[in-house]
């Protein structure tokens, strides 16, 4: 498929990047039902790590099989499939070339103490991504956690290594931790800040949560009110978060959030 002008315009925003990085970005942007539109939907399947197998897959036992998720992403016409090392390896041969993959390089689990600092363990490498033909690496950061600075340093090093071999980086920027309230995790000022941090760390694709109109930080709240920043609708909040990602020069995707009914999804 010939690359569209829309995709060419997006790639032009990634100045200073090598052809390998841009080629892999194009590979994802030109795949699936949204190919060429500049829009992107990624299927992320790391729930087994985060929540355990029964909580993740018991309602649909087919989900225990990694091949199911590959095929789901292909059949749905998505742009890419993201998962931890073991799941990507389990279908790498059977589905080679059929769907771009994103290797999730760090993960957490729900067996740890609630008092442990919010953090994730590095569980895969850039060399794994190369070996498996992945289109990108993925990494989660927790702005607001006491461990956030360590996470920033980890992804900075991994991002540099990945870019040197032509692999883009997707950063899941999910605010949480000791310095942020539960409502603050999806507050618009915090969501925009999370997008900015990911962009500053060099993310080629930024994944954040859809935000509410809550303003968490009192200093930021004053600026939002004084400057009349419109955060009244979901569309305006999405627009503002994209503005925080270098004025729309970086691809931003949004997490689906908590489980909800079809009507709520359509309303979003």
Residue ranges and their predicted role:
Residues 1-46:
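N-terminal basic, low-complexity leaders that serve as flexible interaction/assembly modules and, when applicable
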Residues 1-2, 35, 40, 47-256, ...:
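Alpha/beta enzyme core
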